[in-house]
């Protein structure tokens, strides 16, 4: 599974519970976006970053 380049957030497993209390396995996936970022050495790299890190400004996009 893919993970966030910044915070290493990845898919977690849990249960979906119906009205009659039946439990089925399911996967909670992070909202990952493929973005081109500028690395500290000045180069660019395409990585997967979660939207929470994008909104917080934890990465600098390469334009």
Swiss-Prot record:
Task: Name its GO BP terms in alphabetical order.
Answer: translation
Q: Which UniProt keywords apply?
A: Ribonucleoprotein, Ribosomal protein
Can you supply one Gene Ontology CC term for this chain's record? ribosome
**Which Pfam families does the UniProt entry name for this protein?**
Ribosomal_L28
> Coiled coil located at which positions?
none
Q: Name one GO molecular function term.
A: structural constituent of ribosome
The UniProt family comment states:
Belongs to the bacterial ribosomal protein bL28 family.
Q: Which HAMAP family match?
A: Ribosomal_bL28 (MF_00373)
Q: What is this protein called?
A: Large ribosomal subunit protein bL28
What organism does the UniProt record list as the source?
A: Hydrogenobaculum sp. (strain Y04AAS1)
What is this protein's gene name? rpmB
């Amino acid at each position: 599974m893919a993970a966030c380049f910044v915070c290493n957030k990845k898919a977690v497993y849990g249960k979906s519970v119906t009205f009659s209390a039946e439990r089925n396995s399911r996967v909670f996936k992070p909202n990952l976006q493929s973005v081109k970022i500028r690395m500290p050495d000045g180069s660019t790299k395409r990585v997967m970053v979660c939207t929470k890190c994008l909104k917080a400004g934890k990465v600098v996009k390469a334009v």
